[in-house]
Every structure is written in C-alpha cells, then in structure tokens.
Regions:
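Nucleotide-activated chemistry modules centered on ATP-dependent adenylation/adenylyltransferase
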Residues: 1-177
Length: 177
C-alpha cells in the first residue's frame, strides 16, 4: 500500500458495473453515440494512442482494425529522412522545425496512414496484476528504430550492452516512480 490509511474507492468493481450498464444509462439520458466504436477506450498523447477493449481483457485476442482510431489507408512505400540534433528529432525530409514537437507531429502525419507501430503491450498494472493494452505509435517507433540504427553504427558492443541495461533500469524507475 502506497498511502496507509487511505480508503481506495472502486465503484465499478464494487457495484459490478458493466459497459452495457453505462451505455443503457447514457441512452436513457438521451445521449446518442456510435456504441460500436464506444466499445473501446482510446487515449491519445504525444507518444502514441492506447486502445483498450474486451479483447485486451484476455491473453490471446488481438484488437480488430476498427478499434484503432487511425485506419490503414496507405500501402505504397515512401522514404523518410530524419534529422537529429543531440538525440532529438529536429527535421523530417529536409524540413527543420522550430521544436521537436513539431517534427514529431510531422513524422506522425506521414507514418500514421501506414498503421506503423501497432501492438499489444503486456505489463504490470498499478494494482500488481498483469494487464494488456493495445497501442499505435507510428512516429515514436520510427524515431526509436532510427536511434537504434545510429547506435549500431557508432557504439561498441559493450557500449550497447550497458546502454540497454541503463535504459531498462531507467525506464522501469520512470514508470514505477
């Protein structure tokens, strides 16, 4: 327990509420929506979009195409040139941006139609059990792969080893607090 003496309130679990109960209440209150799409919890941020749904509550099902907010619309390959400065993405296809944020958004716009970076992550939840969540992260995956290629060409095997050890350790502590 992280904060002894604090009561944890879990109404969804305690009241055994189901998604259908939520939908029924919203309909009764006059809220109209595409309930097929509402089956999924979608959270978008700078580094990607997480997608949760009934399929992620199992250990063997993948998410269907329609669960992802960015549909696969492109199939003809394109080449993209990335420019880094001190490890940060600053340019895409020869255009240098004022901020890395703008460069990331530009790369995301190019990569998103290819449905790059889709997967299901399995990890430890805050309550100590394993959990699964789908995600799409086109620009981050390309940036990571770009960094990995640069590292292969510039670091020794022992530098790579220790960099990976430190990255895993740092990532866990950053995530876990």
């Amino acid at each position: 327990i992280m904060i002894p003496g604090v009561t944890i309130i879990t109404p969804i679990r305690d009241m055994k509420l189901a998604r259908q109960t939520e939908i029924d209440k919203l309909i009764a209150w006059g809220f109209n929506w595409n309930w097929e799409k509402a089956k999924y919890s979608v959270n978008k941020g700078l580094w990607g979009t997480s997608v949760g749904g009934v399929e992620t509550l199992t250990s063997h099902k993948g998410l269907p195409e329609e669960a992802f907010p960015s549909p696969l619309t492109a199939s003809n390959p394109v080449s993209v040139t990335l420019q880094f400065a001190k490890g940060e993405l600053v340019g895409v296809d020869g255009k240098v941006f004022d901020t890395s944020l703008e460069a990331i958004h530009a790369l995301q716009t190019i990569a998103e139609p290819f449905a790059i970076g889709r997967d299901i992550h399995v990890g430890d939840t805050i309550i100590g059990i394993k959990g699964r969540v789908g995600f799409e992260a086109a620009a981050p995956l390309i940036i990571i792969k770009g960094h990995q290629l640069l590292e292969k060409h510039t670091l020794t095997k022992w530098q790579m080893f220790w960099k990976n050890q430190q990255a895993e350790f740092y990532g866990n502590h950053l995530h876990e607090g």
